[in-house]
Amino acid sequence: MVTYDPIKHIILFEEEPKRAGFRLDKIELLVCNSQMVDIDLSRQKDSFFDDSLCQFSLLIGVNGVGKTTILRSIIDFFIDFHEYYNHDGYRMTTRKNIQVVGVKYQANGNSYYVCKNENEKKFYVNDSDILNQNIPIPNIVASCFGVFDKFPIKNTMSLSTNRYNVPFYTYVGARAANNTFSASSSLFHMLYNLLSLKKTETILKVRDILKYMGYEDRMRLTCRFKLLANVQSFRGFVQALKKEMDLGASVSRRRWYLENFLSKDKNDKQKVFSTYQDLRKQADDGLSVCHYDFQFNQSQVQSHKDDLRNLYLLKQMGLITQTKLFLYKNGEQINSLDISSGELNMFCTVVGALSASEMENALILIDEPEISQHPNWQMSIIDFLNKGLEGIPCHLLITTHSHFLVSDLTRNRSTVTYLNKTHEGLVSERIKEET
């Protein structure tokens, strides 16, 4: 903040107050409907945690112990609580081997303990069933690029919605675009996540991530587009889209996108039409493939956001039929489909995390980020996330089999929990920092 002191005739620069961080302190599990298990993520009494920085918690253990199920159950727990708190509807939990039945967390400088009672069909907050206060729910980002991804996705391709269409949940995994595992779909959804960034300083972190990976802070998007006949004006553009919807849009997803676009106000539609005209001009100049160059710097961020948003809408409506994204390394142009899957996956993960971290109380769930990554790259995952989320108060809960992630954690900002199954059931063990 900048203020002027009229007495001393000087300009005073005041630091912005630090945002209160979100921290998940405890997860209570019900295992096989009989055993209660606590996962302790709280700070140790003799250690110092800076809540204004991102916190890391790792869940480690052998295959089949239930690490991924725990992450999924955290999402379902907060979805259930949201429905109960806002709509007074209690949802009976589908019987699973592992269920989250309680969480303790820090948000907005306060401590909250939320638990559910299946017998009473109630939620309790700080041991009270009178929910007459403004209880913050974390903004959850879920990311997984494995073939057996278990995270739920929103229904974003029709007028109907599912229970995960809530403002506090974002899925940024490989199935984000169309519920299938597709490299090209993941790539274009990454552009959508870029569009969701509102603050310039947050967008410029994308530039920093590219540099950290060894790439230049620029990209080129090439695309082929569908030429609409006899479209010379905005009115003609709208009429052509209506005709597309009535005659040619047999795919329900595309039809929904067309309906959604046509329902927007005139100003928004004119912006997209302007981008379409730019594409037509390149085609009129004899170019079969159109391209856009994006430089991530302070002066061009806003115009790039507008261009990308409009291109994304044109792609959704089927007017852009093919896209390719190119990155640059040492002056050489590299097709993004040719970069390593590990690089692409982690870049998409961090971009998704950034989009949610602009909001308060961000909880980022990442399932086995080491998948498809060489051991040398695994050693950089934590550094990669630290770089992208530097100065952002959030909590990352990560499941992993990689000892490289454990060894690279920042002291006093991280916890490691070992999960194991014995003849007595599930065992949760907090690993000491000095181990």
Task: Name each model-derived stretch.
Residues 141-144, 220-224, 281, 365, ...:
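A structural signal for short, well-ordered beta-strand segments and their strand-loop junctions
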Residues 77-78, 146-150, 178:
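Short acidic, S/G/P-rich loop/turn micro-motifs used as interaction or catalytic elements
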Residues 29-40, 104-115, 179:
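Short, surface-exposed beta-strand/loop "edge" segments at domain boundaries and coil↔beta transitions
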Residues 2-5, 13-16, 52, 73-138:
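Conserved P-loop NTP-binding catalytic core
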Residues 146-147, 175-176, 400-402:
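Short beta-alpha junction loops
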Residues 111-173:
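Glycine-rich phosphate-binding loops of NTPases
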Residues 2-87, 307, 317-435:
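Switch/communication elements of ASCE P-loop NTPase nucleotide-binding domains
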Residues 2-34, 44-47, 174, 178-344, ...:
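Extended helical coiled-coil dimerization/tether regions that scaffold
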